[in-house]
Every structure is written in C-alpha cells, then in structure tokens.
Amino acid sequence: MANFVLVHGAWHGAWCWRHVTESLIRAGHRAHAVTLTGVGERAHLLGPLITLETHITDVIQAIESEEMTEVVLAVHSYAGMLGTAVADRMPGRLAHLVYVDAVVPRPGESWSSTHASATRESRLAAAAASPSYSFPPPDPSVFGLEGADHEWVKRRQTPHPGHTYEAPLDFDPVRVAQVPRTFINCTRPPLATIDVIRTRVTDPKFWDGAWLAGSRVVELATGHDPMISAPQALTQCLCELAGLAAHT
C-alpha cells in the first residue's frame, strides 16, 4: 500500500482528482486530495491575504494531519511550486515527488516568471482589478478538454489567488534532489504556458546539475488535465511510480 497526496493546480480543487482518488483507493492505496485555500470548495476564503506560503502550508498540514509518511506527492500544474517547497522542507516524509504537467521552478523563481510577458501582464492586471486580488480561469478547452469533461470543469473552476503567482520560491535544490522525482509530460495537446518547463525537464542542455538530471520523464498522450481526460492512465502511472518508490 502506498500513501498518495494529490494537489490540484490553479482554478481547480480536490474535485478534479475524484476519479484518480477512487481508483487508487480501489487498488488498495491510501489517497488524500488537498483543496488549497481560496479555491474549489474553499472559494469562500478567497482574498488578498492568500500567498504562496498559505498554499505550501495547506499541503504540509495535510501530510501532518493525515500522519502520512513515505508519501507519493503528486502535484499538478501550478502546484509544482508547492511540491518543490514541501520536498525542500520535509524530504524525509516523501517517497516520490510527481510533477503532473507541473511547474518545476529554479531557486528564486516565481510561477509568473516561467510565463511569457503577455500572459504574466494579463494575469497581474486582472488580479489588480479584482477586490480579492485574483485572476479568472481560462476556458477548459486550453487543457484539451471536450464535451462533458469541458462542461464539468467549466462549472467547477474558480478564480485563483494572485499573490501566489508573483511570489518567488527559495529552496535548496540539493535537499529537494534527495527525493526521487518524475515529470509527467502531457502531450496531446501540450499546454503552451508550460513550454519553458517542458523544455527544462526534457532537454539535457537546460539541466541544472543533479537537480534536474536526476528526474525521470514519463509521457502521457493526453491534455493538461490528465486526472480528468485520462484518469486510468494517470492512476496506472502513479501506481507504477509508487512501486518504484517502494524499491528505492
């Protein structure tokens, strides 16, 4: 049995992991999906005081309160920032860190600094114009979703706290590198806003020593929300990675 903690990306909530969580539990694993402050069923808490540190604490507290060790921490999209921070602060509690089409920051980077200037300026302008200092979700079609999946995600998405977008993340890459890491690269279609990250983790020219060189890359032929568009394939991948973690 493996212990999974699943963390959603921007505009989502624990709801997006529903099918994966159910499948992991049926397979005999323990699975806990986190909803970050200000989004999902916690959208009523959205406000300008939510920071990157708030969300890092959300994940750490979930691990602590569930009394989990040997955690397979799967982080989606924006939550790559959070997974990196958790690996830095409590590497001994993690068995594997799985970046699901996620941000893989360098020390001192913010999430916004991995984006093109037009994307960055648009989101920051939207946040500045919002009383809650947040920016709205995109149409789910950008995640490669169609039909019922598209409509479900469109109904469920909520604005994302803007200060989490701007804040740089300081961490020790040597400490994070103690944790086995895998990047799941979703390729059909690839999300343009993580092109920088995709290149960073798949092209050895951009590796920063052991920090990225020690990472494994797995491809899934689905869009940016694989927990929705390909839940069984993602579940199988996570179970395989948990098996690897058990033998390291």
Predicted regions and their residues:
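Flexible "cap/lid" loop of the alpha/beta hydrolase fold
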Residues: 88, 92-94, 98-139, 164-165, ...
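Gly/Ala-rich beta-loop-alpha elbow adjacent to hydrolase catalytic centers
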Residues: 74-79, 83
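Active-site nucleophile elbow and catalytic-triad environment of alpha/beta-hydrolase enzymes
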Residues: 155-175
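Conserved alpha/beta-hydrolase
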Residues: 21-44
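Active-site glycine-rich loops that stabilize anionic/oxyanionic intermediates
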Residues: 9-12, 77-78
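Active-site loop/oxyanion-hole signature of alpha/beta-hydrolase fold enzymes
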Residues: 36-72, 88-89, 113-117
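Conserved loop-alpha-helix segment in the C-terminal half of the alpha/beta-hydrolase fold
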Residues: 187-221, 225-228, 233, 240-241
